[in-house]
UniProtKB/Swiss-Prot annotation:
Stated name of the protein: Leucine--tRNA ligase
Protein family according to the UniProt entry: Belongs to the class-I aminoacyl-tRNA synthetase family.
Positions that bind ATP: K622
InterPro entries, A to Z: aa-tRNA-synth_I_CS, aa-tRNA-synth_Ia, Leu-tRNA-ligase, Leu_tRNA-synth_edit, M/V/L/I-tRNA-synth_anticd-bd, Methionyl/Leucyl_tRNA_Synth, Rossmann-like_a/b/a_fold, tRNAsynth_Ia_anticodon-bd
GO cellular component: cytosol
Keywords of this entry: Aminoacyl-tRNA synthetase, ATP-binding, Cytoplasm, Ligase, Nucleotide-binding, Protein biosynthesis
Catalysed transformations (reactions): tRNA(Leu) + L-leucine + ATP = L-leucyl-tRNA(Leu) + AMP + diphosphate
PROSITE patterns with a match to the protein in the record: AA_TRNA_LIGASE_I
GO biological process, one term: leucyl-tRNA aminoacylation
Short motif 'KMSKS' region, span: 619-623
Broad class of enzyme this protein falls into: ligase
Species name: Cereibacter sphaeroides (strain ATCC 17023 / DSM 158 / JCM 6121 / CCUG 31486 / LMG 2827 / NBRC 12203 / NCIMB 8253 / ATH 2.4.1.)
Taxonomy of the source species: Bacteria, Pseudomonadati, Pseudomonadota, Alphaproteobacteria, Rhodobacterales
């Protein structure tokens, strides 16, 4: 008997699939469609086991749906713009384009041996001019639809790299790459009006029934709807033009406990004072050395600067509150100004304590008397409290009721109005980087800011750039910026900012429906293929990418690039767990960890016998040397082993730990399946009484594997295949029944281990390719059990069980029960007083 050789067979079947065009997506109105998509990768140059798990999940779904009769779209592309390519050019020389396309070629070569059912004819990279040119066309359409605008905004500026940094790229007040102290600078930036859709994006989350609840909650919190009061304090002794201070608060019920007002360092009043007061300027400069993110402000020490200005309480003109510039107030939320009620906000409490400000409780826990507070009393809004300075009298009510009463009272007195606000800000997309999609805008001295003419698209990035000095190479290119105004024909200047790379990934799913179209989408193809039926990716993309994609689909619908049904582009979302691995380390003389590769450790020791510390189930990390190279696994065991293991060990939403022993066990099982198929293919036994039992086991396997795959319980589907393998190997059924069952096994395991499935299918005489075979259907009659297992109780205690035909007469059941050894021991030779058979449920024996 020959041996199963994955290295020889896997490439052969991949060639057969390619030759037959098995995975080419076909627009077939006569068939239902199914669009499965995994979040496309950044071309870093190497795939990792997380990629293997992610793409195998999508592949299992795609293959099963194709077998079930769907016309399947399962594409692949590359999220290819971004800073890493520029950083590589700075550090190693060369060009970002060469680095990127080289990495794409490497990763494609690593992915293809996995045998994924991808339609590679639809492949594109977001750095392809053909792709970003269509993105530029949509940008122009969005400008014309009023979805794009330009304004001054405060940003994190790295003075060494000379670029804007995202909040996440500011670490301890310094640029993540340069290490230089970051400053806040005001720059003119381009924005998408995502905030116009805040309410719609929030409400529509309730329609996404096939999204994880955690993701929907994360998005809801990010959008951050709040109901509050917007009103104005009148100011005493204010500079000209600043006689009112507009404030937004979500807790107007605490207005009678106010002790100060505070404004953002970027508030117009703070800007005015900064220009006229050196002390204010110094304080504001200090504030701007902290990042602009809420997290950065939360971690920073809370500081304030007393401006000397005062505002009057709206219900008592004699009650004046000091106005501080505070480093924890965000300009882009609400109005950039707040009032502080220290008794009911811990941040305000610490601020008031630091600066000696009064602390006045507005409400107390039920049954408590007013006393000095050691900390802020901040109950849930749903909790009932006793208001002592409320707007609805001294009574007990919830915070929610108190807020509603405060808004109603203030509105009745002409003090402000109730408003709904959102935490979601407009999306700033300007980046002072080369390796991104150029913003297709022209600056003309006569016409102002105008979009590039569409016939001139794409606005291509110039190749002749250098990265030998910091900053954006487009700014210093000798000719690229120079252009002609498309409106008046005069000399003009091209926009040198490029788009945030999240723009690239916010519509790629739509481009896959017609990747070679001369417009961003093709209406007929988009109408057929959209929406994405199953989207798969990491939960780390729960907010930005997924929220931006939801916005972009709406923008594309408004500008005529997507049908109305596609404003929620992803029908179902699955967020998979990570692939983890043990970390192996020793320590140097100073106690610092020294990490070791898995292949250098045997039985917990290095080659020289030094024992290692083992940290279990850690995220794979190059620096900690616990990364498993999928190519090594494929060379050692074959792609099917890697696919089988990452699907089998745990539910797909949870992390799975990669172990060498687990991979070896998976490989052994697949070799066992091959040997079983080889044995059955040569069997010649006659049909017999066991054929029926095997047919029933096959039907159950079909039902349970189908349920597991369709329900994303891949580990349960694989567990059933293990069980079915055992059943088949033990079965004494005739040769034809076993061959029939083995062919079904090939079909059921084809989504997970497609190469081995083709081997088995061919061995057992299957017609054509199993990848093109219809998904098996279980005979409903074979799923009905014709036996039933009845527990036996003697005087109320369980003594055993008996399996009998469902239709067996009660008198016959009684005979079998009385013949049972456990019952006979309990009776001790005596006759029972009663023997009661409850059909289909239980047998009770009374002694």
């Amino acid at each position: 008997m020959s041996r199963y050789d994955p290295a020889a067979t896997e490439s052969r079947w991949q060639a057969a699939w390619d030759a037959a065009g098995v995975f080419t997506a076909r627009h077939d109105p006569a068939r239902p469609k199914y669009y499965v998509l995994e979040m496309f990768p950044y071309p870093s140059g190497r795939i990792h086991m997380g990629h293997v798990r992610n793409y195998t999940m999508g592949d299992v779904v795609a293959r099963q749906k194709a077998a079930a009769g769907f016309s399947v779209l399962h594409p692949m592309g590359w999220d290819a713009f971004g800073m890493p390519a520029e950083n590589a050019a700075m550090e190693r020389g060369g060009h970002p384009k060469d680095w990127t396309y080289g990495n794409i070629a490497d990763m494609r070569a690593q992915m293809k041996p996995l045998g994924l059912s991808i339609d590679w004819s639809r492949e594109f990279a977001t750095c392809d001019p053909e792709y970003y040119g269509q993105q530029q066309a949509m940008f122009i359409d969005m400008m014309e639809a009023g979805l794009v605008y330009r304004k001054n905004a405060v940003v994190n500026w790295d003075p060494v790299d000379m670029t804007v940094l995202a909040n996440e790229q500011v670490i301890d007040g310094k640029g993540w790459r340069s290490g230089a102290p970051v400053v806040r600078r005001e720059l003119t930036q381009w924005f998408f009006r995502i905030s116009d859709y805040a309410g719609e994006l929030l409400e529509a989350l309730d329609t996404l029934k096939d999204w994880p609840e955690k993701v929907r909650l994360m998005q809801a919190n990010w959008i951050g709807q709040s109901r509050g009061l917007q009103f104005a304090f009148s100011m005493a002794g204010a500079p000209e033009g600043f006689d009112r201070l507009e404030v937004y608060t979500t807790r107007p019920d605490t207005l009678m406990g106010a002790s100060f007002a505070a404004i953002s360092p970027d508030h117009p009043l703070a800007r005015h004072l900064e220009r006229h007061d050196p002390e204010v300027a110094e304080f504001v400069a200090e504030c701007r050395r902290v990042g602009t993110s809420e997290e950065a402000l939360e971690k920073a020490e809370k500081k304030g600067f007393d401006t000397g200005l005062r505002v009057r309480h709206p219900f008592d003109a004699a009650w004046e509150l000091p106005v501080y510039i505070a480093n924890f107030i965000l300009m882009d939320y609400g109005t950039g100004a707040i009032f502080g009620c220290p008794a009911h906000d811990q941040r305000d409490f610490e601020f008031a304590t630091k600066y000696g400000l009064p602390i006045r409780p507005v409400f107390l826990p039920e049954g408590c008397e007013e006393t000095a507070l050691a900390e802020a009393f901040v109950p849930m809004k749903s909790e009932r409290v006793h208001y002592i300075r409320g707007f609805a009298g001294a009574e007990v009510q919830t915070g929610e009721e108190g807020v509603a009463a405060a808004i109603a009272f203030c509105e009745s007195q002409g003090v402000g109005r109730g408003v709904t606000n959102y935490r979601l800000r407009d999306w700033g997309i300007s980046r002072q980087r080369y390796w991104g999609c150029p913003i297709p805008v022209i600056h003309c001295e006569t016409c102002g800011v105008v979009p590039e003419a569409k016939e001139n698209l794409p606005v291509r990035l110039p190749d002749d750039v250098s990265f030998d000095v910091p900053g954006n190479p487009l700014d210093r290119h000798p000719t690229w910026r120079d252009c002609t105004c498309p409106k008046c024909g005069a000399k003009a200047r091209r926009e040198t900012d490029t788009m945030d790379t999240f723009v690239d990934s916010s519509w790629y799913y739509a481009r896959f429906t017609a990747p070679r179209a001369a417009t961003p989408t093709d209406a007929e193809e988009a109408d057929y293929w959209m929406n994405v039926d199953q989207y798969i990716g990491g939960i780390e993309h729960a907010i930005l990418h997924l929220l931006y994609s939801r916005f972009f689909a709406r923008a594309m619908q408004k500008t005529g690039h997507l049908p109305a049904k596609a404003i929620e582009p992803f029908n179902a979302l699955f967020t998979q767990g990570m692939v983890t691995h043990e970390i192996y380390l020793t320590r140097d003389a100073a106690g610092r960890p020294v990490y070791h590769l898995p292949e250098d450790v045997t039985d917990g020791k290095l080659a020289d016998g030094t024992p290692v510390e083992i940290i279990p189930s850690a995220k794979m990390s190059k620096s900690k040397k616990n990364v498993v190279d999928p190519m090594n696994i494929i060379r050692q065991f074959g792609a099917d082993t890697a696919r089988w293991f990452v699907m089998s060990d745990s539910p797909p939403e949870r992390d799975v730990e990669w172990t060498a022993s687990g991979a070896e066990a998976a490989s052994k099982h697949l070799h066992r399946v091959w040997r079983l198929a080889d044995e059955i293919s040569r069997a010649d036994g006659e049909a017999n009484a066991e054929d029926g039992a095997l047919d029933k086991a096959t039907a159950r396997a079909i039902a349970e594997v189908t349920q597991g795959v369709e329900g994303f319980a891949f580990n349960k589907a694989i567990a059933k295949l293990y069980e079915f393998t055992n059943t088949l190997s033990r079965s004494g059924a005739g040769a034809e029944a076993k061959k029939r069952a083995m062919r079904t096994m090939a079909q059921l395991m084809s989504p997970m281990v497609p190469h081995l499935a083709e081997e088995v299918w061919a061995m057992l005489g299957g017609e054509g390719l199993v990848a093109q075979a219809a998904w098996p259907k279980a005979d409903p009659a074979l799923l009905i059990d014709d036996t039933v297992t009845l527990p036996i109780q003697v005087n109320g205690k369980r003594r055993g069980e008996i399996t009998v035909p469902k239709e067996m007469a009660a008198s016959e059941v009684e005979k079998l029960v009385l013949a049972d050894e456990a019952v006979q021991r309990a009776l001790g030779g005596a006759a029972p007083k009663k023997l009661i058979v409850v059909p289909g449920r239980i047998v009770n024996v009374v002694i």
